[in-house]
Amino acid sequence: MTEHETQMGLKPRFLVVMGVSGTGKTTVATGLATRLGWHFQEGDALHPPANVEKMSTGQPLTDADRAPWLALCHDWLREQVKAGHGAVLTCSALKRSYREQLRGDDLPIEFVHIDTSTGELADRLQRREGHFMPASLLPSQLATLEVPGDDEPVIRVSGEKHPDVVLEELIRHFQAED
């Protein structure tokens, strides 16, 4: 356990902060990692260069495009579980099959699904700078999204709230479960 986990009375968790582009995955995930002393991985950084190029030219990814990326995300999660310390990964995890691939080998992964209105997402993506994914791909991501079912290990949070509020809600949730 990290010092932060011990101070807060939390056991290590292995989280995938998920949702379409613009939900605030990175903000929430880095906030959790910082507050709790967990390891963090930006899932976008694991994309093969061909995927980044494809998205940056406005082309949506296919399942075949995503497969090697999801494998790298899974491998990172598996290493974190093996090490036994808390970890947070950002990953859109749009389809149930993607989430199942991330949880392969029976990894104890939990998903934090950030749900944000289409209007808010569009506004955020129009204002966002320095990211390879253009706002024009939002409709494709929304069409691909399979909202996690009640039978999946998911915590739902609102992306409409301030990130600090979301962080506090998540930490309270973890404390209540531990």
Swiss-Prot record:
Associated pathway: Carbohydrate acid metabolism; D-gluconate degradation
One Pfam family in the UniProt entry: AAA_33
Nucleotide-binding as UniProt keyword: yes
Any one annotated GO CC term: cytoplasm
Keywords, alphabetical: ATP-binding, Gluconate utilization, Kinase, Nucleotide-binding, Transferase
The EC number(s) this enzyme carries: 2.7.1.12
Record-linked Gene3D superfamilies: P-loop containing nucleotide triphosphate hydrolases
Coiled coil spans: none
Domain of life: Bacteria
Residues reported in the UniProt entry to bind ATP: G19, V20, S21, G22, T23, G24, K25, T26
Reaction equation(s) it catalyzes: D-gluconate + ATP = 6-phospho-D-gluconate + ADP + H(+)
Gene Ontology terms for molecular function: ATP binding; gluconokinase activity
Regulation (activators, inhibitors): Activated by magnesium.
InterPro entries named among the record's database cross-references: P-loop_NTPase (IPR027417), Therm_gnt_kin (IPR006001)
GO biological process terms held by the UniProt record: D-gluconate metabolic process
PANTHER family xrefs: GLUCONOKINASE-RELATED
Record's subunit section: Monomer.
Family the entry assigns: Belongs to the gluconokinase GntK/GntV family.
Role of this protein: Phosphorylates gluconate to 6-phosphogluconate.
Protein name: Gluconokinase
